């Protein structure tokens, strides 16, 4: 892995951070599902309720996702974790929805060329949620641009890191989902540590093959 820490070290760090917090994350997930499941039921209806449910899903899911990222960031920083952090994403409602829609749009557009460019773009933008959570003054487009910068040269690293959870995913299936109580936060903390790891590194000199022809805002001095 072309980074300061190996995959094994990043995952070991995540396990240590998760120690004593498994049930806290379980509670956070229960709250999230308690909000999203009723909304998903609305989308299955065949009347106006389905439209309301669909709108609610697109309005509620992005800020909740951002709030979850904030919870994981707090844990990796060693900060006290509060359930209320889960709802801090709603303070950035507009930006979280904008980030979700821009990501969806760009990935769909690149997927129209071929599937592979769309997959590559999804990895380019995969750190945007973390960036927006840590930089609330950024716009959604700026977070996407910053994600492209720090993921340049690290997309394969992230893919391999995700692949390293294959057997954990099998364990979830074998245990009928019970193992997810541990595996899910362990995986997400690992990905959060990956973000911390690559954001400290200078961007590689090589340019990406694909780039949007729009948005020309300068990218100097954006890497910590």
Where do the language-model regions lie?
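Hydrophobic alpha-helical membrane segments
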Residues: 1-224
């Amino acid at each position: 892995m072309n980074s300061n820490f190996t995959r094994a070290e990043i995952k070991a760090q995540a396990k240590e951070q998760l120690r004593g917090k498994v049930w806290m994350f379980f509670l956070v997930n229960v709250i999230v599902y308690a909000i999203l499941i009723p909304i998903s039921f609305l989308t299955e209806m065949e009347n106006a309720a389905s439209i309301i449910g669909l709108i609610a899903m697109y309005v509620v899911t992005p800020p909740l996702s951002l709030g979850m990222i904030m919870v994981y960031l707090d844990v990796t920083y060693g900060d006290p974790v509060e359930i209320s952090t889960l709802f801090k994403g709603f303070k950035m409602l507009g930006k979280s929805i904008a980030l979700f829609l821009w990501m969806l749009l760009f990935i769909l557009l690149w997927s129209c060329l071929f599937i592979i460019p769309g997959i590559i773009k999804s990895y380019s933008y995969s750190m945007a949620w973390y960036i927006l959570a840590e930089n609330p003054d950024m716009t959604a487009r700026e977070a996407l641009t910053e994600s492209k910068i720090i993921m340049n040269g690290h997309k394969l690293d992230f893919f391999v890191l995700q692949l390293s959870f294959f057997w954990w995913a099998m364990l979830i299936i074998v245990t009928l989902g019970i193992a997810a109580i541990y595996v899910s936060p362990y995986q997400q903390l690992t990905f959060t540590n990956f973000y911390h790891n690559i954001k400290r590194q200078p961007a590689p000199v090589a340019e990406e093959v694909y780039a949007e022809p729009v948005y020309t805002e300068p990218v100097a001095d954006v890497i910590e």
